[in-house]
Amino acid sequence: MEKVSFSKISVGDEIPELVKKVTLIDLLQYAAATWNFFLTHIDKEFAQKQGFQQVNIPAAYFGACLTKLVSDWIKDPGQIKKLGYRVIRMSFVDDTLKFKGKVSKKYQEAGQNLVDCELWVENQDGVQVATATATVSVLG
């Protein structure tokens, strides 16, 4: 995939989606990388004792995947200037999550080419489980 350039971006352009079937191994690796070993994110029996149907996906995992979605799209030397997200529904191990986005605004400010993006995450049933926004800078 070629690098994104400001001149070729249009409002409404879709960001290539990132699809992840989240496995227990993914969550264990994420726990190790972030030192977040809260048991509802890695132990099914503990999660069920806490009232969850299954091991649940930590909210910060969404942030990591949304960052990957955007950075894979803009590539180096593009930069993520701002990213904010909100998880609105629980997601669980073995869910398939689709990280999606589109360009909502394109502008120049302080000598930078900036692009605002609307982002969201859907589960395997097409239900939105997270929303997000990002601002990125890209070359001409």
Roles of regions detected by a PLM:
Residues 40-46, 80-82, 110-111, 123-128:
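Glycine-rich loops and low-complexity Gly/Arg-rich segments
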Residues 72-95:
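Mid-chain, well-packed structural core segment of small domains
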Residues 1-79:
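Hot-dog-fold acyl-thioester-processing enzymes
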Residues 1-15, 91-140:
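HotDog/MaoC-like acyl-thioester-processing domains
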